[in-house]
Amino acid sequence: MRQKTLDVLEFDKIKSLVANETISDLGLEKVNQMMPATNFETVVFQMEETDEIAQIYNKHRLPSLSGLSKVSAFIHRADIGGVLNVSELNLIKRLIQVQNQFKTFYNQLVEEDEGVKYPILDDKMNQLPVLTDLFQQINETCDTYDLYDNASYELQGIRSKISSTNQRIRQNLDRIVKSQANQKKLSDAIVTVRNERNVIPVKAEYRQDFNGIVHDQSASGQTLYIEPSSVVEMNNQISRLRHDEAIEKERILTQLTGYVAADKDALLVAEQVMGQLDFLIAKARCSRSIKGTKPIFKEERTVYLPKAYHPLLNRETVVANTIEFMEDIETVIITGPNTGGKTVTLKTLGLIIVMAQSGLLIPTLDGSQLSVFKNVYCDIGDEQSIEQSLSTFSSHMTNIVEILKNADKHSLVLFDELGAGTDPSEGAALAMSILDHVRKIGSLVMATTHYPELKAYSYNREGVMNASVEFDVDTLSPTYKLLMGVPGRSNAFDISKKLGLSLNIINKAKTMIGTDEKEINEMIESLERNYKRVETQRLELDRLVKEAEQVHDDLSKQYQQFQNYEKSLIEDAKEKANQKIKAATKEADDIIKDLRQLREQKGADVKEHELIDKKKRLDDHYEAKSIKQNVQKQKYDKIVAGDEVKVLSYGQKGEVLEIVNDEEAIVQMGIIKMKLPIEDLEKKQKEKVKPTKMVTRQNRQTIKTELDLRGYRYEDALIELDQYLDQAVLSNYEQVYIIHGKGTGALQKGVQQHLKKHKSVSDFRGGMPSEGGFGVTVATLK
């Protein structure tokens, strides 16, 4: 895109806004290189890239990029054998630290909100290399200013010697300066440094009292800085140690530089990605400051900018206007008063397109649509050149000639006051001819003019639409509102009347203008009134639609709350009912258990299937808490006699003996034969019958509720206890009595320890006097 166009549209000021938001020289470099793209895919990618980071920036607090700096020069120097200093290594360390912090932040962000995807940013995060080892090597070796003492064993030893020698020098010099005899001979009782040597300030007249080397003197010459002979050798030793220290530091820095060179490619990738992120975040910050939104780019030629405003004007006072090239409209001609905002409208359109194609969000409401232009051509403002001795008209015409040579169907052309600066009739004719030529080329055109002839131009051409900037006759000032589809009209008579000009003069003037022009002005006035009425109705309609949407949202939320409340009430009712049924079921289980025991002990006539059926009636009253709890039988092939089935209501397996009819079947469940609904049966796959082995066993007799272990040996007693507890559990006993006698207490202790570990025992206690006292332990079974 032409630099001249960017200059006229003041794109450099937009770049300055973005540059002010960058953190690093990397981001600033990207801003300086920022130019509008002209390839459709590139433009879309750049906008998506900015929008992704803007979404994150508007919702979250981004990690700091402070300290990020360009390090590629250091990396290249390391690669060719140079040695980096501590400051340069720290900048590389900070690059790694910043990229790690941002990657951690992004990973946490994605984990917290899995539904949101950032494909472009995700790709950038995947590009960031792992440089943990290099970071640790630098971090453990030096701080911001110098190498750590423990950077190497040799460096630690050298610095330790320097420290101890310095301490001895200080002690020696302290004795001299604190000596009572020397107080009057010293300018000050301090130890200072000159030429990297420890010295004391001696008055010039007492020079002969101090043996040593004079390293410096005061400006007045009254103070000499003397290194006493007693510390000369120690200072020499420090100089040698400093030299050794420098050699060791050089060795360590060379080693660290080698590590940097080994990771040069990864570091350059990290620098490139983080620089781009700084650039994108700066775009996001700038976009938020102008309340920018993301436009939709279309392949077909489109311009729709709802409530667009110029981003360089004061946001509080600027008037936002909708700029739109409606379907089949290729040329828009704006008429209206001077200083009414026509030129600002042109610049707003041109600058927004340049911004959008540079990957910047644009100052419009949501829903803007744009196509991608290969070039934007402008003839805006007074570009008169004094040096070239060109008039205003000549200057504009020179620019227009160049535009007409280069413009094509992929161009946007902006003409400000087309044909101005010459005879009105000739200027209007030239303007119409130029517009016809540009329309023939196929460019999209927006032009401003004050020629009345151009108001009728759109009515004689297809694809041309009039527009105007509104003028308030009451306040005698422009409103800066753009009226699409309405041509501007002359307000001279109204303004003159407002200013107090005689009505006789005004009326006579009206008779002097042509009938056609008068009718045109009346038509335009009518159009303006209709436009305002329609615009008012549209605004009212928009308000009503928003209110309706709000009411709809409120009602939807209330309905959802009602449904949740209703569901909660039903669930609570089911829960309470289930609790009551559960209590009744437990009571029934206890009764059935007692009846079984009674049958086993006394042979009572109790029918098993009657007990199960009674309990099933309680189970039928259970309410499922959720769909997942509703058991639905699986549909298999048709059930026939001989099939193995599961009886869903009892949870038991059985065999179908006979199909009574389409709805019922006779099923054998163990020793019970029942007629059941077929829908209560679930067909099972027959298991392969394994050959059975005949095992003879004795009939199990009913066991007692007590076990007498008296007379048993310790080990035998515990074996007998285990067997007894198993039988007691099978007999559904809740409590049994273990008789172990008193004796030495060893058997009692062993029994109780065994009961404590047994899986079927929930509790035990010593016997009451009526139960046998200490000779008995009472165990409660699970």
Curated annotation (Swiss-Prot):
Do you know which SUPFAM superfamilies this protein is assigned to? DNA repair protein MutS, domain III (SSF48334), P-loop containing nucleoside triphosphate hydrolases (SSF52540), SMR domain-like (SSF160443)
Where the record annotates domain Smr, the positions are 707-782
Q: Which UniProt keywords apply?
A: ATP-binding, DNA-binding, Endonuclease, Hydrolase, Nuclease, Nucleotide-binding, RNA-binding, rRNA-binding
**What class does this enzyme belong to in the EC scheme?**
hydrolase
Q: Name one GO biological process term.
A: mismatch repair
Can you name one GO molecular function term for this protein?
Answer: endonuclease activity
Q: What EC number(s) does the entry state?
A: 3.1.-.-, 3.6.4.-
Residues recorded as binding ATP, renumbered to this chain, are G336, P337, N338, T339, G340, G341, K342, T343
Q: Which residues form a coiled coil?
A: none
Q: What does this protein do?
A: Endonuclease that is involved in the suppression of homologous recombination and thus may have a key role in the control of bacterial genetic diversity.
Q: How does it assemble?
A: Homodimer. Binds to stalled ribosomes, contacting rRNA.
The family database entries (PANTHER family) matched by this protein are listed as: OS10G0509000 PROTEIN, OS10G0509000 PROTEIN-RELATED
The protein here is known as: Endonuclease MutS2
Supply the source organism for this entry.
Staphylococcus aureus (strain MRSA252)
